Amino acid sequence: MLNNAMSVVILAAGKGTRMYSDLPKVLHTLAGKAMVQHVIDAANELGAAHVHLVYGHGGDLLKQALKDDNLNWVLQAEQLGTGHAMQQAAPFFADDEDILMLYGDVPLISVETLQRLRDAKPQGGIGLLTVKLDDPTGYGRITRENGKVTGIVEHKDATDEQRQIQEINTGILIANGADMKRWLAKLTNNNAQGEYYITDIIALAYQEGREIVAVHPQRLSEVEGVNNRLQLSRLERVYQSEQAEKLLLAGVMLRDPARFDLRGTLTHGRDVEIDTNVIIEGNVTLGHRVKIGTGCVIKNSVIGDDCEISPYTVVEDANLAAACTIGPFARLRPGAELLEGAHVGNFVEMKKARLGKGSKVGHLTYLGDAEIGDNVNIGAGTITCNYDGANKFKTIIGDDVFVGSDTQLVAPVTVGKGATIAAGTTVTRNVGENALAISRVPQTQKEGWRRPVKKK
């Protein structure tokens, strides 16, 4: 079906009193992303020409959090109902476009459902998203005559008979821009709440002989709103369960789907294995046969084929070539790069550092602002001293270097190919190729030495 141009209005003016938070409700996160951002992303994926965000409480925080989005900001200074919110956005509606109304606290609405709603909207009429609930208490009821939608009655305004209706309004609808503006201008606040209800446009459309078509979402969770942290946590579990199911069906082995969190996008190869309590954040790529141990956090990183990440390792903004091994308890910070077959062991931290092919950093080491060649062995307790309190400097270590334990490399410094650094050395000058650098104080020995003894 050929669709008209479409713009989206997202209502996000509510304070969210029941969240007990200084943060606007729609900025609370689900799967690591603000609820309203999920809705904005859906609108953009649907091809919205414009996204109008109606805001009120916490406007500065909203603008700061969503500054990278191409949004039209619409202020609703007083929260006088959904109809009033739409009235604030109405001056921006084009007559020949469709207007889709969404909510910033309904984060799991799917693009597929919205596209079906868009396709179902009759010419000159309204497409309405509805669901049937066993217990519809508190929701606006869909009224029908001979099967046709005639209106929506809010729960507080409904008669006892109307309250028996199980089909309820989700609040999501689509209509033509010119029609929407005309109906919005006719709204009144003559109701129990003293508010302007967007739902009243359904009756107005019916009175004009316009067709109203109801569409149901694929899943109830798509239209569930969030008013408190309990509801948010429940939707988080729903979302994570859905993501885990998709990954399992795509061939990823999740040892316990209930203990896996995806807070971004995961691209993966074949035969990937992920143990319990792993968190994936941002954009992550896992190659073929990657294994991730329990308790790991992987963020905005690329992990090559046949890599193994042992338990409780944190990898952020890093790149690993094939067949690397990391951890347990390792930390790769932004700018860390491991070439093929490199090894980073327990309690090793890397930042803005490259580790060459086959090189090994076994344990208890910090490598920052460093470039390390191939087949290098870094002993335990090695530190690149890259910061003088004001500026950072680089350490360069050539191929086939052996660095003994408890070595400090005071940058800027270069260690030539094939050099050896003796254990306990503080390197302050460049070391030539194949040279031995040693700076230990000569050992002295006193025979028959007795330790002092405390007097009783």
UniProtKB/Swiss-Prot annotation:
It is an enzyme of class 2 (transferase). One of its GO terms (molecular function) is magnesium ion binding. It catalyses: alpha-D-glucosamine 1-phosphate + acetyl-CoA = N-acetyl-alpha-D-glucosamine 1-phosphate + CoA + H(+); N-acetyl-alpha-D-glucosamine 1-phosphate + UTP + H(+) = UDP-N-acetyl-alpha-D-glucosamine + diphosphate. GO terms for cellular component: cytoplasm; membrane. The keyword DNA repair does not apply. Its cofactor is Mg(2+). Pfam families: Hexapep, NTP_transf_3. The active site is at H363 (proton acceptor). Binds 1 Mg(2+) ion per subunit. Pathway: Nucleotide-sugar biosynthesis; UDP-N-acetyl-alpha-D-glucosamine biosynthesis; N-acetyl-alpha-D-glucosamine 1-phosphate from alpha-D-glucosamine 6-phosphate (route II): step 2/2; Nucleotide-sugar biosynthesis; UDP-N-acetyl-alpha-D-glucosamine biosynthesis; UDP-N-acetyl-alpha-D-glucosamine from N-acetyl-alpha-D-glucosamine 1-phosphate: step 1/1; Bacterial outer membrane biogenesis; LPS lipid A biosynthesis. InterPro entries: Bifunctional_GlmU, GlmU-like, GlmU_C_LbH, Hexapep, Hexapep_transf_CS, MobA-like_NTP_Trfase, Nucleotide-diphossugar_trans, Trimer_LpxA-like_sf. The keyword Amino-acid biosynthesis does not apply. PROSITE patterns: HEXAPEP_TRANSFERASES. UDP-N-acetyl-alpha-D-glucosamine binds at residues 11-14, 25, 76, 81-82, 103-105, 140, 154, 169, 227, 333, 351, 366, 377. Keywords: Acyltransferase, Cell shape, Cell wall biogenesis/degradation, Cytoplasm, Magnesium, Metal-binding, Multifunctional enzyme, Nucleotidyltransferase, Peptidoglycan synthesis, Repeat, Transferase. Its EC number is 2.7.7.23, 2.3.1.157. Coiled coil: none annotated. Residues 1-229 are annotated as: Pyrophosphorylase. One of its GO terms (biological process) is cell wall organization. Residues 230-250 are annotated as: Linker. Its main location: cytoplasm. Residues 251-456 are annotated as: N-acetyltransferase. Homotrimer. Catalyzes the last two sequential reactions in the de novo biosynthetic pathway for UDP-N-acetylglucosamine (UDP-GlcNAc). The C-terminal domain catalyzes the transfer of acetyl group from acetyl coenzyme A to glucosamine-1-phosphate (GlcN-1-P) to produce N-acetylglucosamine-1-phosphate (GlcNAc-1-P), which is converted into UDP-GlcNAc by the transfer of uridine 5-monophosphate (from uridine 5-triphosphate), a reaction catalyzed by the N-terminal domain. In the N-terminal section; belongs to the N-acetylglucosamine-1-phosphate uridyltransferase family. In the C-terminal section; belongs to the transferase hexapeptide repeat family. This is Bifunctional protein GlmU.
